[in-house]
């Protein structure tokens, strides 16, 4: 079976349709087809988000997770609350590595200090319309006495940290309390690797 790569894509035109906090680019392109030959010229919109990081905070001694709650505009127009329970997360800025972002965002959003950082996965969050590439980590932290409000006021962040015993996670999942894809992926990973992680970190 033939494998396709960047040589099988031709960009005919590229322009910026919108530039604000995010960019929206408009492309005219064509690509090779599985049956042979080239597609007709296609128009595709691309929401340019770049790279992002998500961090699952885990305390192996307490066997507990740290989750943040904050308002999300993307959830504001569906049933349920637009305040989501999710991972610590943030964007990779120029000159930063994903691991550095994980450390920075963990401090800003939770007040916790990462003691050890374990890569979990890297993936495109929704490649049909955005170029965002997500780096997922699990971080060993101490959640003893953790909680309260966090975030950078200058960035209008209003974040509440929740400490959740791992034993309560299945019931919360069944109740639909985790509806963010990155969070669900991280929780599934922890369910598969929790015993191994606890042995390594305790």
Question: Which residues make up each language-model segment?
Answer:
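Conserved Nudix-box catalytic region and its N-terminal flanking loop in Nudix hydrolases
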Residues: 44-47, 64-104, 153-155, 159
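Active-site-adjacent beta-strand/loop module that shapes the phosphate/pyrophosphate-binding cleft
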Residues: 29-34, 126-147
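A short coil-to-beta-strand element that immediately follows conserved catalytic motifs
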Residues: 10, 113-120
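Short, solvent-exposed loop/turn elements at beta->coil junctions and helix N-caps
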Residues: 14-17, 121-126
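A short, amphipathic edge element
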Residues: 1-15
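NUDIX/MutT-family hydrolases
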Residues: 151-177
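Conserved hydrophobic/aromatic beta-strand scaffold that supports enzyme active sites
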Residues: 24-26, 67, 136-138, 161-163
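Acidic, metal-coordinating catalytic segment for phosphate/diphosphate chemistry
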Residues: 16-62, 76
């Amino acid at each position: 079976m033939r494998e396709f790569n960047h040589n099988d894509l031709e960009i005919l035109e590229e322009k910026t349709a919108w530039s604000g906090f995010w960019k929206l680019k408009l492309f005219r392109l064509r690509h090779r087809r599985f049956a042979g030959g080239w597609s007709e010229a296609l128009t595709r919109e691309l929401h340019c988000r770049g790279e992002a990081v998500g961090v699952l905070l885990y305390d192996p001694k307490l066997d507990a997770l740290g989750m943040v709650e904050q308002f999300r505009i993307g959830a504001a127009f569906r049933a349920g609350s637009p305040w989501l329970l999710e991972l610590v997360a943030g964007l990779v800025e120029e000159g930063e590595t994903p691991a550095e972002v994980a450390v920075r965002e963990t401090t800003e959003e939770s007040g916790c200090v990462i003691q050890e950082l374990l890569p979990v996965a890297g993936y495109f969050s929704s490649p049909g319309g955005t170029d965002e590439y997500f780096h997922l980590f699990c971080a060993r932290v101490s959640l003893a006495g953790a909680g309260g409000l966090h975030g950078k006021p200058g960035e209008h962040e209003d974040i509440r940290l929740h400490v959740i015993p791992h034993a309560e996670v299945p019931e919360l999942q069944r109740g639909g309390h985790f509806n963010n894809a990155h969070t669900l992926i991280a929780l599934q990973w922890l369910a598969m690797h929790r015993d191994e992680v606890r042995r390594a970190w305790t």
